[in-house]
Amino acid sequence: MESSFQELYKKGLDIGEQQKQRQKELLKQQKLRRQQEQDDYRPLQNQEKPVPRKKSGKRSGHQKGIPYRPQLSEWLRHKPDDLNEWLLVPCPVGKRCLVVASKGITKAYSKGGWMFVNFRSSLPGDWQLQKGETILDCVYVEDADTFYVLDAISFGLQEVQECEASFRFYWLRARFEEHDYDKISENNEKKFKLLDHFDFEDPSAVEQALHKYPFFPENKPDLDGFLFYHKEASYVCRETPLVCWLFPFMMEDVLGLPVNKCYKAPEDYQPSHVLQYMDAFEQKLAEHRRTLKEQKKKVNEQKEDPHTMEAEEDVESDEYDSLKRVLDQQRRLELGEFDMDCAEPPSADGC
């Protein structure tokens, strides 16, 4: 797979065209893999879970507890030719994490694999339904103490990682309609809310979602941006071109779809140079990473203990959220007071 992608770079294709080609190649590979697995089906409990690449010996211990990582998106650098084959998911500001219900307990793990909370839930794998394992891809909003569910790797005895995104979303919707996972109870200590998805085959539904402001009641939580899932894509525990991302103010410039005027763009954003803005954002992110590495190097010179290591990993795993918060604060300062017609309450810092 890597060699075919390297060929795209050798051909000198622009980044947007490279993304198109990688999307087609991955869809082809995933479809073939699903067909092979159907021909040689194995129950979930007998499947070998993916083993992540170890970054270093000192961090291998915590990875044994969570052999998965969240699926990460790329910038959407072009309007897909098959836009009707994509789903739109509005994403709130919060802490990206994986929630695992297994062996009678539910645990939430940061992007770096560190457990930051454990509790009881009514998800399959916890409470009375301890058979199987549930792994949900979520955004945790601390102020509301709520997990907003994006996607799933497994749900009880049902393995869905290799299923198409359209089926995964359908399956989750059906399960959430059957159970009150968004209600606090003795056996469900935290709320789980399934995020809505909108099919580009229904332009009116997408248009309504883009013009809704605030998207979440009372703007709590804030809308961070929009995720785009290809309907036929499997869930992969890494960055993938089959899940893409745009900030609200980019929607019209990339897709030709206007959004509510209350979604303000930064002053340095130029609609005709949206790709350059993405590149500049990535450059700022790279600089932020270098700063983090320097800070971690200083920490490593001190005596290490598990708490120090955990703090390091949390900083690294949430580096994107940290940078986003800095840029958002910068943008708010540039804008000054919000337009009174679009007034919004102070937003919580992204975790």
Curated annotation (Swiss-Prot):
<keyword id="KW-0963">Cytoplasm</keyword>
<protein>
    <recommendedName>
        <fullName>Snurportin-1</fullName>
    </recommendedName>
</protein>
<dbReference type="GO" id="GO:0030619">
    <property type="term" value="F:U1 snRNA binding"/>
</dbReference>
<dbReference type="GO" id="GO:0016607">
    <property type="term" value="C:nuclear speck"/>
</dbReference>
<feature type="compositionally biased region" description="Basic and acidic residues">
    <location>
        <begin position="8"/>
        <end position="42"/>
    </location>
</feature>
<keyword id="KW-0175">Coiled coil</keyword>
<feature type="region of interest" description="Disordered">
    <location>
        <begin position="294"/>
        <end position="322"/>
    </location>
</feature>
<comment type="function">
    <text>Functions as an U snRNP-specific nuclear import adapter. Involved in the trimethylguanosine (m3G)-cap-dependent nuclear import of U snRNPs. Binds specifically to the terminal m3G-cap U snRNAs.</text>
</comment>
<dbReference type="GO" id="GO:0015030">
    <property type="term" value="C:Cajal body"/>
</dbReference>
<dbReference type="InterPro" id="IPR017336">
    <property type="entry name" value="Snurportin-1"/>
</dbReference>
<keyword id="KW-0813">Transport</keyword>
<keyword id="KW-0539">Nucleus</keyword>
<dbReference type="GO" id="GO:0071254">
    <property type="term" value="C:cytoplasmic U snRNP body"/>
</dbReference>
<keyword id="KW-0694">RNA-binding</keyword>
<comment type="subunit">
    <text>Interacts with components of the snRNP complex including SmB and Smn; these interactions are RNA-dependent. Interacts with importin-7 msk but not with importin subunit beta Fs(2)Ket; the interaction is RNA-dependent.</text>
</comment>
<feature type="compositionally biased region" description="Basic residues">
    <location>
        <begin position="52"/>
        <end position="62"/>
    </location>
</feature>
<dbReference type="GO" id="GO:0030621">
    <property type="term" value="F:U4 snRNA binding"/>
</dbReference>
<feature type="coiled-coil region">
    <location>
        <begin position="274"/>
        <end position="330"/>
    </location>
</feature>
<comment type="similarity">
    <text>Belongs to the snurportin family.</text>
</comment>
<feature type="compositionally biased region" description="Basic and acidic residues">
    <location>
        <begin position="294"/>
        <end position="310"/>
    </location>
</feature>
<dbReference type="Pfam" id="PF21974">
    <property type="entry name" value="SPN1_m3Gcap_bd"/>
</dbReference>
<dbReference type="InterPro" id="IPR047857">
    <property type="entry name" value="Snurportin1_C"/>
</dbReference>
<dbReference type="GO" id="GO:0061015">
    <property type="term" value="P:snRNA import into nucleus"/>
</dbReference>
<dbReference type="GO" id="GO:0030620">
    <property type="term" value="F:U2 snRNA binding"/>
</dbReference>
<feature type="region of interest" description="Disordered">
    <location>
        <begin position="1"/>
        <end position="66"/>
    </location>
</feature>
<feature type="compositionally biased region" description="Acidic residues">
    <location>
        <begin position="311"/>
        <end position="320"/>
    </location>
</feature>
